[in-house]
Amino acid sequence: MDQSNRYADLSLTEAELIAGGQHILCAYKMKPKAGHRYLEAAAHFAAESSTGTNVEVCTTDEFTKGVDALVYHIDEASEDMRIAYPLDLFDRNMTDGRMMMASFLTLTIGNNQGMGDIEHAKMVDFYVPRRGIELFDGPSKDISDLWRMLGRPVKDGGYIAGTIIKPKLGLRPEPFARAAYEFWLGGDFIKNDEPQGNQVFAPLKKVIPLVYDSMKRAMDETGEAKLFSMNITADDHFEMCARADFALEAFGPDADKLAFLVDGYVGGPGMITTARRQYPNQYLHYHRAGHGAVTSPSSKRGYTAYVLAKMSRLQGASGIHVGTMGYGKMEGDKDDRACAYIIERDSYTGPVYHQEWYGMKPTTPIISGGMNALRLPGFFENLGHGNVINTAGGGAYGHIDSPAAGARSLRQAYDCWKAGADPVEWARDHYEFARAFESFPQDADQLYPGWRHKLRPAA
């Protein structure tokens, strides 16, 4: 059934829709299946995403038609389809009237992903008007809160050197806590790897007090504050809160140095919102494990990593992993810096839409996945700044000397970039950074050819 007379209006302009402030706009790359006309398939997509179905129903009235989603732009050659969703379509909380990400996803990326007349459709950008922005929670804490605890300026406080406890699984409580202590002697921030939780060989009630003891020892010995991001991901929100509450009690007077990590893609938006609302005084660390199933460029359905990052800020994530932009082991390229810019800036023009954030706090880009000191100078140069958290697991625990030396090499890499220095020359006067060349020789050969002749290996 051709529904384009009702669910498409190509006379609408994007500028008018944005000026009106009453619609969320979504841009997709959409291709219909063979034998289906583009506008007809697009209109069916909009119908399925809002008030319609595959036939006319007798219960539809004029009010219903007033909240139809409308296709307002198509370009078949570039597979560009854009839809305007009235704000009133989206579900609101009974308790406080605020918007919810679950409803946004249900409408804009729900049943339309399995429609029989659509070959593929992937959301590449979306726009939220001011009224919508103000109805989402947004972050309660941001990187400035971490800088403050670390004794740094709250503006442009710089690079936070972090790690992931490695190996990913298999450490018992005492070795786990020892690994944390050894890194904290040189670094700032430690996160659980995403599978680490309450395994039978490492129960949280034993691990967390030992980790806190390691933190206190490291703070006493270095005179620096330290930060720990604990994984509270669980199927049950009550279990999440039980883990969080236990950790807060264990950390006691240093509870402000405790962040909560939530696997937001596998756990869903309800898990992020639970953590954001139940623990507004903690830094909310959004891990995105599994996202590549839909965000990968090889997938033509779902949504992009840029869309995921943008959603995370609306939900209230203090920080989210944004990949390594081609400088680490994760899929991506240099242009992925847009994922960082949309979450950290007050406004940004993405692939399709310009987004203003109207005072919503920023979300920190978290860089992780195959990074080490040798890869960081190029990464910072591409991004244009170092106001990020970097969690380098192998980059710290794979350092030839120690995890503490690995942490120092990461800090020295940031200082190298900030000074505009040549990394090989910088290594001559920065021992831990120099030893990173020997720790990761394949990277050194690729990134800094001739380093072996220019840099005498340390004894």
From Swiss-Prot:
- Residues holding substrate: N111, K168, R288, H321, S368
Named from the GO MF annotations, one term is: monooxygenase activity
Which family does the entry's similarity section mention? Belongs to the RuBisCO large chain family. Type II subfamily.
Native organism is Dechloromonas aromatica (strain RCB)
Q: Where is the active site?
A: K166, H287
Which SUPFAM superfamilies does the UniProt entry name for this protein? RuBisCo, C-terminal domain, RuBisCO, large subunit, small (N-terminal) domain
Q: What gene is behind this protein?
A: cbbM
Q: Tell me which EC number(s) this protein carries.
A: 4.1.1.39
Protein name as it appears in the record = Ribulose bisphosphate carboxylase
